[in-house]
Design a protein with these regions (language model features):
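Acidic/His- and Gly-rich active-site-bordering loop/insert found
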Residues: 29-135, 148, 154-163, 342
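Acidic/histidine-rich catalytic neighborhood of metal-dependent amide-processing enzymes
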Residues: 131-132, 138-217
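A short core secondary-structure module
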Residues: 182-187, 235, 240-264
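Bacterial N-terminal signal peptides
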Residues: 11-24
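A common structural junction motif
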Residues: 108-109, 258-263, 360-368
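Short amphipathic alpha-helices in soluble, non-transmembrane regions
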Residues: 245, 355-363
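An extended, acidic, His-containing surface patch that forms the Zn2+-binding/catalytic region
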Residues: 97-99, 204-207, 266-329, 336, ...
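Acidic/histidine-rich, surface-exposed loop or edge segments in extracytoplasmic proteins
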Residues: 42-52, 231-234, 366-374
């Protein structure tokens, strides 16, 4: 009997988490050691200048940008609109082979950016100090151009293919994907017939303090979002004469209880395996503690140190983040209603309804309404040994015998739409980043180094060729 975790055979999980696989030589040399990298820089700068802040999205402008490129390259393409101004771009490079197609997935929308806080205008796409600056440089306009260059490079050089390559740029990912990948999977499933693998954001190459690669990460599973809105009601009036039971006061008390609340620690088998595999990167006591994280967390001193690091804490517990508060729009008006948006991320296997019931008890005020804004079930990627092998060989070829690990994704991506249909969707774009670099995603002064971007273009092409070239 084959043992599985989250639907993935133990043998494959072992390969993912420990990855001590001997590299094999690629069947063919890479198409080009240096694709049109200067062209790619110009494309990325232009792409960043297309403001696709969601809301409202306006991805139609980005879709038209890509369509012009594909038309120029002679690649089959079409724009698929899901709502006014909301669009997805689909392009397909067809092969003569019978192998299942591969999708290069990315999203075209970006989160808002406050220009007053940035050193460079967030939609300038300026190239300065060795970086390309702008919202989306990392999430996910930079990776989209990396994927684009793989497709058009292989088309230009007439590489014989054993599988179709699909480029898919979606709308609305930053708001849950209902108008993007969700819409396409529901309304246009024919576009994905015969698809065997999807590559998306969610993994990459992690650097150490010395600038050298420490390990590669592949996204195979993610925490699931449970976005909530808490609403309190009370007597409205003039700010000069406050009454008891004000909506804002009730909301603040409830939010304070949430801030004080500590969700329980749960070490899932997938997480235990990830830290055990990552233990080789640690030294001293930390190595043995990571080797058996569940046991180590019973030590209060280690637990306090470990949970102090946000990315570690989020890997072993449900998280609750207050992300927005709304009351009156005038200083001297007491509102009848006050609300707060809450971003909850649940570990795989958690029941959203049960979690909300527990949250109500923490809040301790039955008059506060709890509304679900977004929720969907967790989905772990079905296995795809060939993709893992291609990523592992890429690591060995360029960075030696370093681990390839599968951490639990703390955010969510469009992958879940494909995983729910049984299609393997792996998070991996070969861009190099540090722990501190994560703060640039959705943060101030988002930027990608030109060197990193150009290397990713070469590495992505190398990996895609391994998967689809004859």
């Amino acid at each position: 009997m084959n043992q599985t975790i989250g639907g993935i055979p133990m043998a494959l999980l072992s390969a993912i988490f420990h990855v001590v696989i001997c590299a094999t030589v690629f069947a063919a040399e890479p198409v080009s050691r240096r694709p049109a990298e200067e062209e790619a820089i110009a494309l990325l700068r232009h792409y960043i200048q297309i403001d696709t802040t969601n809301p409202p999205g306006n991805e139609i402008k980005a879709a038209q940008f890509f369509k012009e490129i594909f038309n120029r390259e002679g690649i089959e393409t079409k724009i698929i609109e899901s709502a006014q101004g909301r669009a997805n771009i689909y392009a397909r490079l067809r092969s003569a082979g019978a192998k299942k197609a591969i999708v290069l997935l990315n999203h075209m929308d970006v989160v808002p950016a406050d220009a007053k806080l940035w050193k460079e205008p967030p939609f300038s796409g300026v190239s300065k100090d060795g970086y390309i600056w702008g919202r989306g440089a990392l999430d996910m306009k930079g990776p989209a151009i990396v994927e684009l260059m793989s497709l058009i490079s292989m088309k230009r050089q007439g590489v014989p293919l054993k599988a179709d390559i699909i480029f898919l740029g979606t709308a609305d990912e930053e708001a849950g994907g209902a108008l993007g990948a969700g819409f396409l999977m529901e309304k246009h499933p024919e576009l994905f017939e015969g698809v065997g693998l999807v590559l998306n954001e969610g993994g990459g190459i992690r650097l150490g303090g010395d600038g050298r690669a420490r390990y590669y990460t592949v996204g195979v599973a993610e925490k699931t979002p449970l976005w909530l809105r808490l609403t309190a009601t009370g007597a409205p009036g003039h700010g000069s004469t406050p009454r008891a039971e004000l909506a804002v006061n009730k909301l603040v008390l409830a939010l304070n209880r949430l801030i004080q609340y500590q969700t329980p620690v749960k070490v899932l088998p997938e997480v235990q395996k990830f830290y055990a595999a990552a233990a080789v990167l640690e030294s001293g006591a930390r190595r043995s503690q990571f080797a058996d994280l569940q046991a180590a967390l019973k030590d209060p001193l280690f637990a306090a140190e470990f949970l102090k690091e946000p990315r570690h804490s989020a890997s072993v517990r449900n998280t609750v983040a207050i992300t927005g508060i709304k009351g009156s729009n005038k200083v001297n008006v007491i509102p009848a209603q006050a609300s707060a948006n809450i971003d909850v991320r649940l570990l795989p296997g958690e029941d959203p309804t049960a979690f909300i019931d527990g949250l109500r008890k923490v809040i301790g005020d039955e008059s506060i309404k709890v509304e679900v804004l977004l929720s969907f079930p967790p989905a772990t990627s079905p296995p795809h040994a060939e993709a893992i092998r291609a990523i592992t060989e890429l690591a060995r070829r360029h960075d030696g015998n370093i681990p390839v690990l599968a951490p639990l994704g703390r955010g969510f991506t469009d992958c879940h739409f494909f995983r729910e249909k049984g299609v393997p969707c792996y998070g991996f774009i070969p861009m190099r980043g540090t722990d501190g670099g994560e703060s640039l995603v959705h943060g101030i002064d988002e930027r990608v180094s030109v060197e990193n971007f150009q290397w990713a273009i070469r590495a992505m092409l190398e990996m895609v060729q391994k998967l689809v070239a004859e």
